[in-house]
């Protein structure tokens, strides 16, 4: 252990000066303060989604934040996760669907809340050594998810605007939601189903009219290392989804070789975007290329909420960048992971609506680098802390056992 710690100290020193290390420490302290501030909200005492703008306990935000909650080792945050899981189980529908708000059983219709509940519950069980915690709710949720596969072959489908991107069109077999399905299948020991899903996702995406009607859609983009945004029958989008692809790396859906190529491709594409003035920061946009008004997949409503480089149409989201830092660690690119962590530390500093020393904003405008969402966002703070732990430990807690042995744990 002493040797590992010494080697880590040497590696950190190679990439970070004292000022950078101090800045990360300050950001860690601020992130923890934000999470503790948000741990008790006005809705049944459940955690807030943000310090100001979002007082509600949004399921997806809090389940994603489980990674950061548990990474801190803080008992109050672990209890906040436990209370949220209990509330979700109590408000689960009779058939197993998990609502979008932890306190409101009638806020339904999301495609990612049930797989995220299963994911967050598995993390809590492992951390607390409670393998049977909320078992009835887990079994009901697993059953619900089985019926979300249109052809009864594990891969699940979704309706547009039903996942975390409530202002973006993703339909059919979406990458992000299916990476969550793969993750919970691995965590719950459903290895046969997980293997089947991984095989399906790694098939070539079939485009055009000549598709064999008996061939299942895949998500691999021909001649590219990344996975498509979505695919369903003759419809698909080969735009790049940073969250989905980062999860594909972390979970081991991507082979070690593909994962390394994918990270290299992301960096090359982002460098080209910066050269064109499309990206102002040293972190990737959540989606690219951006959807423009003359593109076939543009929707009139995007002019209001989803302009190019904004929000779900290429905004830079700190919580997603936390996953990307972890993905860099997963492929063994510690030099890159350190650099991206420093960039993320700079990204979470500015505030937008509420003056604070550290903003931990919701999302950042890609072309200007200016914060544009809500400050003190729970998942922004939580995933920052998770990213820091990944870099400092040089592994990816909770994900390592999902990946093939030759991909860095």
Each predicted region: which residue ranges?
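Extended amphipathic alpha-helical segments enriched in small hydrophobics
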Residues: 173-201, 315-351
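Short glycine/serine- and small hydrophobic-enriched flexible loop segments
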Residues: 67-71, 119-126, 183-190, 250, ...
């Amino acid at each position: 252990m002493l040797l590992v710690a010494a080697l880590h100290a040497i590696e950190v020193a190679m990439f970070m000066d004292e000022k950078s290390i101090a800045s990360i420490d300050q950001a860690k302290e601020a992130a923890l303060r934000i999470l503790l501030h948000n741990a008790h909200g006005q809705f049944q005492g459940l955690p807030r989604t943000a310090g100001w703008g979002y007082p509600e306990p949004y399921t997806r935000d809090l389940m994603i934040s489980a990674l950061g909650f548990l990474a801190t080792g803080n008992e109050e945050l672990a209890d906040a996760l436990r209370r949220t899981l209990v509330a979700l189980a109590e408000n689960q529908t009779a058939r197993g669907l998990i609502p979008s708000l932890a306190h409101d059983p009638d806020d339904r219709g999301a495609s990612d809340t049930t797989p995220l509940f299963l994911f967050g519950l598995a993390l809590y069980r492992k951390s607390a050594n409670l393998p049977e915690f909320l078992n009835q709710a887990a079994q009901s949720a697993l059953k619900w998810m089985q019926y979300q596969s249109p052809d009864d072959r594990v891969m699940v489908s979704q309706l547009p605007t039903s996942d975390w991107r409530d202002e973006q069109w993703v339909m059919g077999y979406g990458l992000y939601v299916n990476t969550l399905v793969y993750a919970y299948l691995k965590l719950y020991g459903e290895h046969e189903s997980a293997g089947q899903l991984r095989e399906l996702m790694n098939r070539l995406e079939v485009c055009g009219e000549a598709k064999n009607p008996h061939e299942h859609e895949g998500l691999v983009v021909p001649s590219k290392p990344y996975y498509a945004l979505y695919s369903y029958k003759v419809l698909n989008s080969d735009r790049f989804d940073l969250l989905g692809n980062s999860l594909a790396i972390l979970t081991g859906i991507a082979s070690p070789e593909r994962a390394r190529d994918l990270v290299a491709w992301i960096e090359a594409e982002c460098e080209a975007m910066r050269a064109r003035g499309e990206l102002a920061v040293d972190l990737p946009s959540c989606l690219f290329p951006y959807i423009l008004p003359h593109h076939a997949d543009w929707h009139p409503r995007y002019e209001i909420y989803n302009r190019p480089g904004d929000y779900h149409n290429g905004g830079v989201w700190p919580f997603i960048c936390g996953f990307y830092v972890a993905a860099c660690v997963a492929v063994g690119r510690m030099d890159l992971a350190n650099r991206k962590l420093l960039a993320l530390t700079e990204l979470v500093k500015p505030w937008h609506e509420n003056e604070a020393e550290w903003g931990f904003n919701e999302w950042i405008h890609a072309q200007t680098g200016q914060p544009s969402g809500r400050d003190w966002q729970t998942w922004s703070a939580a995933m920052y802390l998770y990213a820091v732990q990944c870099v400092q430990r040089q592994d990816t807690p909770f994900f390592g056992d999902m990946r093939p042995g030759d991909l860095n744990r």
